[in-house]
Swiss-Prot record:
Keywords: Transferase
A Pfam family hit: PPDK_N
Protein name as catalogued: Uncharacterized phosphotransferase YvkC
Record lineage: Bacteria, Bacillati, Bacillota, Bacilli, Bacillales
SUPFAM superfamilies recorded: Glutathione synthetase ATP-binding domain-like, Phosphohistidine domain
Similarity field: Belongs to the PEP-utilizing enzyme family.
Annotated active site: 787
Spans through the membrane: none
Superkingdom field: Bacteria
């Protein structure tokens, strides 16, 4: 017998191949598998015998393709094919080697899969192609690499009814990104599953807690989908509506999770599953061991002292995402995690702010702090001697600590290093990060104490805890972010006054501007001025905290795109800034006059003037410390990357970001190739970028959650949310109605149009250029003192922040009303 139905076949990889054996197991245990049959491994042996072929024959692949079926073999196979076709419009033909999908050798993508097979001729041809794939060069090479020695060609074939999947994807019963046994991960998109499996689409991602079935989800672009055509498979573009919504409902995700748990229980080890959904029915198309997870975990995600362990998960850890966006690269984590912990602990001893940070660690590439509540509130006089001079205090530290070190870094970036000098400079940089973040918090914490003091006075006088108006009384104060914007606006004024420059900016895309400007004398002079501007204001990157992204100094594209935006929208910076300043003065004078007690009025005014004088600290310290330190470090570290690339440690200097500090130090003195490790970590880093990290870990008390929200904003979704109402933190007052535009990163800035409501995870100073066009601002993370809140108040537009779910629940084109005074978002109509 050469062919046998799934439900009748023996669970033997030697007869059915590994893929076939798994489908037989699933079918016999009642899991939802489309009907099919196995062409057993003895069929290939018979075919080779009939055609006088041996495994050692020259061009055995070609011999199989040109070979002929004996009548006996052909009749049996085609009879099974026609019986299956009675129930299905077409079939899928897949290779099923005895070696494939077994532990230690997944052979993923090494063999063949053919979809939408309808005729006998196609069927027999694809059977031969599957057999031939066993002898292909790429498979032989892979088997050699995996130390897989097969004595005889044990290649079976799976023939399965083709499900015309409306949605499909892959499930990992153990999270392959974090290796967390408590979670499963689903990648899904529209149409047939080949688009997801082959990596041709950016799928939706669902992470499911296997106990509580709590779902975290990240929407993917889902650029295309595949479907059965008259012949073969057709690839089509997804519609805007399809892209903007999740392809699976929560109910479907939970049902998939339940089936996955049953499958995992059946095997007794982690599995991955390919699935399809048609007519509301879930089908399992394949299941196999997750063969590389332990090796990947060992090779690519070594547990370091600053990574959260399983034991750590018993404590309460707060995601620091409102301050540090997204996952951080391995090298940057080596610098920033120890620096944050050191700086927080040292500074909190001097300036207690009501919370204690015990540790700072990494989870899924994201930075978390272990917070401890219950600290004694600061004394009345804590930091008071600095209150009148906070801004001056900051600039004294910047001038005496940071700027001299930056000049040293600039020199080091121009130096041709030996391994020894590079190592010495690298270690100096690591040590400076500790100093830098101690001083960072020495600047920030006294300002927090002062602002909290003034806010408490304000609330005592008002008799309420409404915050938006309080912070609007602190707007209209120039800072480095606004100063940068004003310089860019002045460039736009120059463009508008010069017809030749104006033509370039009006008629070209942002990425074309530099090339066009370089073609004329006026353009070259303009670029020269832009480059001079960048030497002062360009020490910032697309990603606010990391070394991994280009900085403005390296590429004038970012500045030119911002200038073009000002040219396009006709925004007048000075006029708008003056309006904000006048609004602030009016608000404050009205409030001050409402205080009847002269002594209280005088005391409030004194604290207010101190607070207003220090209102630039949030952005100025970011400009000189957070952004500039990482930018200067990047330029220097690229020299280290060049040295390692020359010595064969890595292929490209920017692979450096995917090594840890100790590996860099060892490789400088004892070069060995770390390229494979760097590539694996780069892949994992990008997976972290796509996944949604939890807002917190552990099981916090209500008091811990409350304390956390006072620091970073909302950490859980508001329980008042309904289908058409979302609540968040009221961060900038006013009401506005407009269409939603979800922006996920800087690459999408050009899609934002004047009058849109900006919806995003969070903002950094790079995003400031969008505020001049925005009707309102909505974020998933952040609180009343976040960048988005401060800049929204400066631009006088409503902002609701810390919604946790806005980027998931809203879609491009939805018409919404944003009430920045109450923190309420209302969906007026769906797109």
């Amino acid at each position: 017998m050469y062919s046998v139905l799934f439900r009748q076949a023996e669970e033997s990889s030697q007869l059915a191949g590994a893929k076939g054996m798994n489908l037989i197991k699933l079918t016999k245990h009642g899991l939802p598998v489309p009907d099919g049959f196995i062409i057993q491994t003895n069929a290939l042996a018979r075919f080779m015998e009939d055609n006088q072929l041996q495994e050692t024959s020259e061009n055995v692949e070609g011999g199989i393709i040109s070979g002929t079926f004996s009548d006996e073999l052909k009749d049996e196979l085609t009879s099974s094919f026609y019986k299956l076709r009675e129930s299905y419009r077409s079939v899928a033909v897949r290779s099923s080697s005895a070696s494939e999908d077994l532990e230690g050798a997944s052979f993923a993508g090494q063999y063949e899969t053919y979809l939408n097979i309808k005729t006998e001729e196609e069927f027999l041809a694809k059977v031969k192609e599957c057999w031939a794939s066993f002898f292909s060069g790429r498979v032989s090479s892979y088997k050699k690499k995996m130390n897989n020695q097969i004595a005889e060609p044990l290649m079976g074939i799976v023939v399965q009814g083709l499900i015309d999947s409306e949605m499909s994807g892959v499930i990992f019963s153990r999270n392959p990104v974090t290796h967390d046994d408590r979670e499963l991960l689903i990648s899904a998109s529209y149409g047939l599953g080949e688009a997801v499996v082959s990596g041709n689409v950016t799928p939706d991602t669902f992470i499911v807690n296997k106990s509580s079935f709590e779902i975290q989800k990240e929407i993917g672009a889902k650029e295309i989908y595949m479907e059965s055509a008259a012949e073969g498979i057709a690839e089509k573009e997804t519609s805007e509506d399809m892209r903007s919504r999740f392809c699976l409902t929560d109910e479907q995700v939970i049902e998939l999770a339940e089936i996955t748990k049953k499958t995992e229980d059946l095997y007794g080890y982690p599995v991955d599953i390919e699935f399809g959904i048609a007519d509301h029915q879930i089908y399992l198309l394949q299941a196999r061991p997750i063969t590389t997870i332990d090796q990947d975990k060992k090779a690519a995600e070594e547990k370091r002292s600053f990574m959260i362990t399983d034991t750590d998960m018993n404590d309460f850890w707060l995601n620091m995402e409102s301050n540090i966006e997204g996952p951080v690269s391995p090298l940057f984590s080596s610098f920033i995690v120890p620096a944050l912990e050191y700086g927080l602990k040292k500074s909190m001893q001097k300036f207690p702010i009501g919370v204690v940070v015990d540790e700072v660690k990494l989870y899924r590439g994201h930075i978390y702090s272990k917070n401890q509540g219950g600290q004694q509130p600061p004394s009345e006089d804590c930091g008071k001697e600095l209150f009148p001079i906070l801004s001056e205090h900051m600039y004294d530290i910047i001038n005496h600590t940071y700027l001299p070190f930056y000049r040293t870094l600039d020199q080091l970036a121009q130096t041709e290093h030996t391994a020894e000098s590079a190592l010495e400079a690298f270690q100096k940089l690591k040590a400076f990060y500790l100093t830098a973040y101690e001083e960072h918090f020495n600047i920030v914490f006294p300002q927090i104490l002062l602002t909290n003091k003034l806010q408490a006075m304000y609330q005592d006088i008002q008799g309420e805890s409404e915050n938006a108006h309080f912070y609007e009384m602190l707007t209209g104060k120039m800072n480095k972010s606004l100063e940068t914007d004003r310089c860019l606006w002045l460039f736009s004024v120059e463009v508008q006054e010069n017809p030749n420059l104006l033509a370039i900016f009006e008629n070209n895309k942002p990425e074309q501007l530099q090339e066009k400007l370089e073609q004329t004398d006026e353009g070259r002079h303009f670029l020269k001025n832009v480059h001079e501007f960048l030497q002062e204001y360009g020490w910032r990157s697309v990603k606010s905290h990391d070394l991994i992204e280009q900085i403005w100094v390296e590429n004038p594209y970012f500045a030119l795109a911002n200038i073009q935006n000002y040219v396009r929208n006709g925004y007048h910076f000075d006029n708008e800034f003056q309006k904000t300043k006048e609004k602030r003065e009016k608000l404050y004078n009205e409030f001050l006059e409402s205080i009847e007690d002269p002594g209280l009025r005088t005391e409030f005014d004194r604290y207010y003037q101190w607070t207003l004088n220090s209102a630039n600290i949030k952005d100025d310290h970011h400009f000189y410390i957070d952004a500039m330190l990482d930018a200067k470090a990047r330029i220097f570290l690229l020299k280290i990357g060049e040295l390692l690339a020359e010595n064969g440690v890595i292929q490209d200097r920017e692979d450096l970001w995917f090594l840890y500090d100790d590996e860099v130090e060892q490789a400088l003195l004892h070069p060995v190739s770390l390229q494979e490790k760097a590539e694996k970590r780069r892949q994992i880093f990008h997976e972290y970028e796509l996944a949604q990290a939890p807002a917190y870990l552990g099981t916090p008390t209500k008091e811990q959650l409350k304390a956390a929200e006072e620091i970073v904003g909302a950490v859980i979704e508001d329980e008042k949310n309904t289908e058409n109402h979302i609540f968040g933190i009221a961060a900038s007052s006013g009401i506005a109605t407009g269409p939603v535009k979800i922006i996920r990163d800087a690459n999408e800035f050009s899609q934002f149009a004047p009058g849109d409501v900006l919806v995003c995870k969070m903002t950094t100073p790079l995003w400031t250029s969008l505020f001049q066009d925005a009707k309102a601002i909505i974020t998933d993370t952040g609180g009343i003192l976040s960048h988005a809140a401060i800049i929204a108040r400066e631009y006088g537009i409503p902002a609701v922040l810390g919604t946790r779910t806005a980027t998931e629940r809203l879609r491009d084109g939805d018409i919404i009303t944003v009430d920045g005074s109450s923190g309420k978002i209302t969906v007026v109509s769906r797109s």
